[in-house]
A protein has these predicted regions:
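Conserved phosphate- and dinucleotide-binding cores of soluble alpha/beta proteins
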Residues: 1-168
């Protein structure tokens, strides 16, 4: 029942504490940058609570619910603060449709607009990606800007094109 949700959320947090905290937090990431169901605007201090799902999140979940009209409008989620208390965090992302949000999460500023960016502040986070999800990262697109590269013909060609465009040549 709705009137018991707040109590349930408090009890859930208490059980986590009683068990000594979370050792490993395994997360996916939504197109909006949500982790769990911590939608854009979520604060880094939040704990388990009921939230209203973002329209994009509901659309993305539609196939799991046999249509968008069947996707719940609200969900209970572990808060960002609770997630950040885990000793180890692993975030997984696969597919080209995750590449832009992964780049913003890993390389962008920490912001409540993209809750996954809070993971930058965690001392023990791994981001595991396939090549498609990593495609928009600087280290994939322009590796010569961030590390030493083995200058093979394809990379030389990409670097020359990039530099020519940058110099308007």
């Amino acid at each position: 029942p709705m009137e018991q949700v707040a109590e349930y959320c408090r009890d859930y947090e208490a059980k986590i504490a009683q068990c000594g905290g979370i050792d490993i937090q395994l997360l996916g990431i939504g197109r909006t940058g949500h982790i769990g169901f911590n939608e854009p605007g979520s604060d880094h201090t939040t704990h388990t609570r009921m939230i209203t799902l973002d329209t994009v999140t509901r659309i993305d979940a539609a196939s799991d619910f046999f249509g968008a009209e069947n996707v719940p409008r609200r969900a209970i989620t572990m808060g960002v603060g609770t997630i950040l208390e885990a000793r180890k965090i692993i975030i997984l992302a696969f597919g080209e449709n995750k590449s832009v949000i992964i780049a913003r999460t890993v390389e962008g500023d920490v912001t409540p607009a993209i809750p996954a960016t809070y993971l930058q502040k965690h001392p023990n986070t791994d981001v595991l990606l396939d090549a498609a999800a990593a495609a928009a990262l600087t280290r994939t697109r322009l590796p010569w800007l961030v590390s030493n590269v083995q200058w093979e013909p394809s990379i030389i060609r990409r670097a020359i094109i990039w530099l020519s465009e940058k110099m308007s040549k």
